[in-house]
């Protein structure tokens, strides 16, 4: 299964990515259980979390093929390699860094770099990006996405990240979004698994609104 097939397999089950910034390794598995129970099948552990590679390792070992687990805020090629060694299969960046994308592609992992302009997007795609992350979405709009969708390849998934709320998903979907990255609205450091499950279910319900 190549990177694109891997991503689509999990996005097709639920087009949401749980970004659990600030989670600790001791919390990761219980938080992962809550996210899995909600129906979400993709987890991103930002690398500016406490001991993130250990959290990725534990989540990847626990869920195996049932979830797509990886690292976020990946800023250089060395971090790509570290995530892979920890069992992660997804690399998410806040920016369009060709070196990071190419290293991710060479490693056979899913590459989801951040972009904001069409120039960013085409640079990322030329480097081999699997998907594109519109970030920060708070500074864009569904109208902006719709205009970008008119020129970007139709088969490239675009994920919306930044300020996404359960009641704001539908306009983005109608504009051409394929999924969403859920950050602070889903998880805050120290949050309980029960609260995480409640918030995750609200986002899953928002997809059907």
Regions found by a protein language model. Give the residues of each.
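Glycine-rich phosphate-binding active-site loops on the catalytic face of alpha/beta enzymes
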Residues: 90, 94-100, 133-142, 175-199
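Conserved N-terminal beta1-alpha1 strand-loop-helix module at the mouth
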Residues: 1-86, 96, 106, 166-167, ...
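Catalytic cores of alpha/beta
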Residues: 76-86, 119-127, 164-180
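A charged, well-structured terminal subsegment
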Residues: 145-152
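Hydrophobic faces of well-ordered beta-strands that scaffold small-molecule active sites
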Residues: 16-20, 43-45, 69-72, 91-92, ...
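Glycine-enriched alpha-helix->loop->beta-strand junction motifs that scaffold or abut catalytic
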Residues: 36-41, 63-66, 85-91, 106-112, ...
